[in-house]
């Protein structure tokens, strides 16, 4: 039997999604709680592995099990055994052909910037603080140069293990709500650090340090060293994963909760 779950988590206290030796991860905590409910070892597969300090409101996982439990066990029961920073949002029995990673057709991330002279006292782990005068309209205009399929070598981490640097960006928008600026980007898949590297370069344009066409130049040059520094992890959220309609995967509000959809 294959089970899919929707997972929300605050990644600030974890080494990232992926299970690792001697350090705590979201995956390790989730598998521990699931194994307690199933009374057998459970291993999960996720839609997208997030880095240390990165959050998720729309992470999707699947696992296989031989035991039958009511939906309440996989939600309320698992949540009772999880730390407060991780929560199951929904559960669905799925066909064995469903795969959380390989069945996905798109992923969507949101990066939230707190643009204010002074650092925040609340939500400090869920925002990235930048105090300069940021022009979000310039950032949005520049971001449109990312649309379509490109070689994103300039925006991939040096240690990225992906065989191909090509990715297809479907949508990208930069909006402001008061002191909050949100970069919202959807693509078929993302390279390691791709979103944070894109945000770092868009910020340079928004701050007036680079021209509007800089993104196109960076795409063309295919050199990570030419782009801006990687943006901080704490403002980044995996908010949605898209699957073919045949799987009927539940859809919730994108989040994060303090931002309007």
Curated annotation (Swiss-Prot):
Pfam families in the cross-refs: PseudoU_synth_1
Active site: residue positions: 51
Catalytic activity entry: uridine(38/39/40) in tRNA = pseudouridine(38/39/40) in tRNA
Gene3D superfamilies membership: Pseudouridine synthase I, catalytic domain, C-terminal subdomain, Pseudouridine synthase I, catalytic domain, N-terminal subdomain
Disulfide bond entries: none
GO BP: any one term: tRNA pseudouridine synthesis
Binding site for substrate: 109
Keyword tRNA processing on entry: yes
Molecular-function GO terms, alphabetical: RNA binding; tRNA pseudouridine(38-40) synthase activity
CDD domains in the cross-refs: PseudoU_synth_EcTruA
UniProtKB keywords: Isomerase, tRNA processing
EC number: 5.4.99.12
Subunit composition and interactions: Homodimer.
Family, similarity comment: Belongs to the tRNA pseudouridine synthase TruA family.
Function noted in UniProt: Formation of pseudouridine at positions 38, 39 and 40 in the anticodon stem and loop of transfer RNAs.
Protein name, entry field: tRNA pseudouridine synthase A
Source organism (scientific name): Shewanella denitrificans (strain OS217 / ATCC BAA-1090 / DSM 15013)
Gene: truA
């Amino acid at each position: 039997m294959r089970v899919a779950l929707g997972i929300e988590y605050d990644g600030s206290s974890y080494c990232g999604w992926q299970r690792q030796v001697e350090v705590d991860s979201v995956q390790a905590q989730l598998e521990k709680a699931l194994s307690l409910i199933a009374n057998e070892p459970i291993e999960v597969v996720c839609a997208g592995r997030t880095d240390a300090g990165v959050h998720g409101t729309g992470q999707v996982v699947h696992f296989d099990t031989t035991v039958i439990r009511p939906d309440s066990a996989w939600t309320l029961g698992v949540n009772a055994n999880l730390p407060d920073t991780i929560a199951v949002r929904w559960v669905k029995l799925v066909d064995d052909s469903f795969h959380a990673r390989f069945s996905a057709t798109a992923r969507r991330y949101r990066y939230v910037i707190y643009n204010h002279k002074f650092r925040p006292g609340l939500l400090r782990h869920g925002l990235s603080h930048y105090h300069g005068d940021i022009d979000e309209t310039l950032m949005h205009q520049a971001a449109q140069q990312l649309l379509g399929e490109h070689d994103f070598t300039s925006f991939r981490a040096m240690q990225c293990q992906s065989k191909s640097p090509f990715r297809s960006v479907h949508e990208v928008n930069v909006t402001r709500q008061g002191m909050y600026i949100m970069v919202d980007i959807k693509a078929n898949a993302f390279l390691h650090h791709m979103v944070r590297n894109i945000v770092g370069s868009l910020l340079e344009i928004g701050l007036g340090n680079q021209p509007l066409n800089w993104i196109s130049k960076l795409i063309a040059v295919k050199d990570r060293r030419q782009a801006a520094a990687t943006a901080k992890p704490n403002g980044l959220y995996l908010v949605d994963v898209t699957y073919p309609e045949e799987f009927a995967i539940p859809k919730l509000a994108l989040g994060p909760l303090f931002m309007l959809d």
